[in-house]
């Protein structure tokens, strides 16, 4: 099959040049593509038809084809050049750096020939491969470290970066591996002996050789190295002399040749290779050097006749095996003047306090020169400008003393170089340097980095957050320079200081212990202290001013109009003839924040009649924008929003109820129709009062029943007479009541305020024209209780005793409307306020029920002659003036008696109750 394909390619190679010669005029420009090798069959190489300028529709008629059909073909559907066979760069181009397939593309009708070049890029698809499965080596155990062995290289078909890069072996203690490059560029491994082999210990070694290429990821190949250790050595080395003698001047330069020792071995090869070494002589190895291969001995140090005048060296010669030989080398040293002075410290103080006095001895120094005569006379001095000096005490003795003031903060250490010079020619000298450490004393107080600190902290900060950091430095050392921080004083209360801030003693970080509130605390100042740990301790103080920044955390609060329990504003009255610009009222609000956060603006959110009123953006003034029209309602409602200038802004709302009226009488019906908001606190008080009233009624009924039973047993009483002032009984059948009827003359005045929606009674005054009742009858079956006092009596209709009228719903009071004590009343009041809460609430119920009847015009206690009048006032406070003691004349809720007058009952009018069904006034009905 392969041969047939090759024959076909040969035929194509012959045919296409022939065609090219025929149609050379039709050859177009060259087209070039680049692809990686080993692309899968069917992979697109390029858009051949498009690059040739051919459309896909004409491909079937043009019969587009390529000459390299073993590798490529043309798709007639898309016109793409596709891979038709395996493209192996290594097989096609071998190790050429550039690999390209060149072929021709032929199109017919008309005939055109195009030259196409496909460059094949190398990929790392070939791992390094060793030809041999293993490598065998034989190494004698006498082989010296450093011996190299070249090994067979591996083969990698890839090129350039994907080719073979390096060799490695598994770690071991005897061998290492390096990679070498041959002149042709190929790389081969070299095995290096790192440690002598011992056949008796290990006769063979097995290594794994790995070859790695430079691809990403890299590919590798391995093979085994088998090393066999051989042993053959039967002759010992022999020195030419047993003792070698030589003379040498002292102070000769290093590396000076002394002599050469020589030994021979009759063996051949590796067994005849001899190495030399000093034998158990530390002095020899420190002053002399022996070449292990040649036997040359050279100087390796300074030879001093004054120290040693003669050296004896023992030398050992060893062949490649285990045989050795020994000889001695005697070296005589010739004396010269070669000794420099020596400086020795007899005593030395390394730590010097910085407050030491002048003249304090720091060190005692001894100088010595091994030479004699002038060469042995020595002088000493210091080299640098230091606050120390040398003073001679005796021959060859000096002392180092303090010659200037010491300051550790400026210079903590001194390097003092002492030079000793003899008087020889040429003079020899020596230098000795010592380091003197200046010890610290606590002579510096901490210094803050700033004269004062000012920090800005936003309110509502998280507790525990750091708000500032103070920093102080102390140039002293150790505890003398270790600074701790504390709060010394503050303009806050001492009890509150720890609850506001704290400071870290180590870092000086000031922490907020609580969330600050700009509205409560806008700024405060702390006095912080930095204190070192010296003895005595030194300290410094600094002020820290904390400015608490404002956040928009407070919504505006509406002061006027005052809000009712349901959050709505109260009524304001506007004249019907009010001109445009008439000031109706003013919304007053405050914001606890500051700055822009407290800059308030007023906006109308909702209006019953848009355009009727205008609202001042900054003033909050409500003015009429136009005159009241005929179609405008008399009652108007404005929903006003008050916004601050914060980001984001906060707001509050207020509701204004406005009534257009020219007189107070027009306002009352509107106020009566207004449902009162439910107050949970008022309802609770109402329930308590009702419960107390029921208990009291039950108790009174029990007392009355007991008295009635006792009276029935008494036979001495007249059945038709009254046995008490206010209590009568009859045993006969019911007789129409025979009593006088009358009215109690009272007058009432109504006052209305724009901020109140309740009818509150200012005073209850008894007119002097009150006529006393003529007589009082008590019906026995109904057991009506008639309450009376010494001066006045109120008659009750016994026919209505079984139909109790409910109290008006207005009788309950809020906490702000509770009647005050006598301290808030006039001192000349003739009446007495009830002295307990129960009586007080009963009186309040009676007054409010009467006020409700007076407000809607249906009250039986009218304002005419001979009637009881009430004075009511609308306002935020409820006060009673000139209230006589009516506790004996007042109806108690829960009883069968109803507060009324005879005229009201004759007319068939029911008293005003709590059901809220009140009649409108006459003026209201006309409307």
Swiss-Prot record:
UniProt cross-references to PANTHER family, sorted A to Z: CADHERIN-87A (PTHR24028), PROTOCADHERIN GAMMA-B1 (PTHR24028:SF106)
Entry function: Potential calcium-dependent cell-adhesion protein. May be involved in the establishment and maintenance of specific neuronal connections in the brain.
InterPro entries documented for this protein: Cadherin-like_dom (IPR002126), Cadherin-like_sf (IPR015919), Cadherin_C (IPR032455), Cadherin_CBD (IPR031904), Cadherin_CS (IPR020894), Cadherin_N (IPR013164), Protocadherin/Cadherin-CA (IPR050174)
Signal peptide: 1-28
Transmembrane segments: 688-708
Extracellular side: 29-687
Protein name per its UniProtKB record: Protocadherin gamma-B1
Membrane protein topology class: Single-pass type I membrane protein
Gene name of the record: PCDHGB1
GO MF annotations, alphabetized: calcium ion binding
Domain Cadherin stretches: 29-130, 131-239, 240-343, 344-448, 449-558, 566-671
SUPFAM superfamilies assigned to the protein according to its UniProt record, in alphabetical order: Cadherin-like (SSF49313)
Biased composition (Polar residues): 799-836
UniProt source species: Homo sapiens
Short name of any one Pfam family annotated for the protein: Cadherin
Subcellular location: Cell membrane
Residues annotated as glycosylated: 41, 73, 300, 415, 541
Cellular component terms per the entry's GO annotation: growth cone; plasma membrane
